[in-house]
Amino acid sequence: METATLITIFLSGLLVSFTGYALYTAFGQPSQQLRDPFEEHGD
């Protein structure tokens, strides 16, 4: 394969991996440990 194709595939995979990890952190198991500043200030 050409170098440009390999770089494109690598960067695409990196972007998909980062997006998946961000979604997992926001909505998966680790989200239980995140603090909610709006919950702390119940006006």
UniProtKB/Swiss-Prot annotation:
Compartments, record wording: Plastid membrane
Keyword Metal-binding: no
Alphabetic keyword roster: Membrane, Plastid, Transmembrane, Transmembrane helix
Membrane topology note: Single-pass membrane protein
Transmembrane as UniProt keyword: yes
Domain of life the protein comes from: Eukaryota
A GO CC term assigned to this protein in UniProt: thylakoid membrane
Record field: transmembrane: 7-29
Pfam families in alphabetical order: PsbN (PF02468)
GO biological process, one term: photosynthesis
Function: May play a role in photosystem I and II biogenesis.
Similarity comment: family membership: Belongs to the PsbN family.
Protein name per UniProt: Protein PsbN
Annotated gene: psbN
